[in-house]
């Protein structure tokens, strides 16, 4: 299972949120470029980067910093946050980003998602963020009446190969991932699934790996030292 250390960017700094609440923000490193390099040096093989400013503004805000992170870390990166037009997708991918995550627009603008998938294939991932099972958009500020599973099935029909699923109620809480929802997704859609939100320990990563998922994202647990990079490297090597 691929495990992605997460770097969330706000005002040019690495931060962590609690349950997606921008007022409950903790700065974990003032230098995201150094953080990206540190993860790579310690064995990370793929980074998950979210432009939180971009998610709020609806356009990429931290492009220059993200490019420098990619160049410095010298490993693949996937990026999400505020990607709502083909021009933005083009810019990221043409600047060397390996995969872009279309979040809010996956729900609000399915034609855009379809066009991006047709043009770039596996370089496009869909991000599904849900609260109590319903999809949230616009930096998690708006909650829709669409269930996470219904949207995942739509994404699969469009040709999306990778879905990143975040349970907002668990994000940044260290309460454990939502194994039930991940198992439900695994049963009903045949795409690469990446779990995000709530990972608190090596045991959580192992439990996700046992579901047969493609990947998992580790954020707060890494910064709080509940999980080490050596844990991540070791769990990635285990065959379940």
UniProtKB/Swiss-Prot annotation:
Q: Which reaction does it catalyse?
A: 1-(5-phospho-beta-D-ribosyl)-5-[(5-phospho-beta-D-ribosylamino)methylideneamino]imidazole-4-carboxamide = 5-[(5-phospho-1-deoxy-D-ribulos-1-ylimino)methylamino]-1-(5-phospho-beta-D-ribosyl)imidazole-4-carboxamide
Please state the gene responsible for encoding this protein.
Answer: hisA
Instruction: Please name the InterPro entries in this protein's record.
Output: Aldolase_TIM (IPR013785), His_biosynth (IPR006062), HisA_bact_arch (IPR006063), Isoase_HisA-like (IPR044524), Isoase_HisA-like_bact (IPR023016), RibuloseP-bd_barrel (IPR011060)
Q: Which residues form a coiled coil?
A: none
Q: Which Pfam families match?
A: His_biosynth
Q: Which organism is it from?
A: Listeria monocytogenes serovar 1/2a (strain ATCC BAA-679 / EGD-e)
Q: Which GO terms describe its cellular component?
A: cytoplasm
- UniProt-annotated location(s): Cytoplasm
Any single GO BP term = L-histidine biosynthetic process
Protein name according to UniProt = 1-(5-phosphoribosyl)-5-[(5-phosphoribosylamino)methylideneamino] imidazole-4-carboxamide isomerase
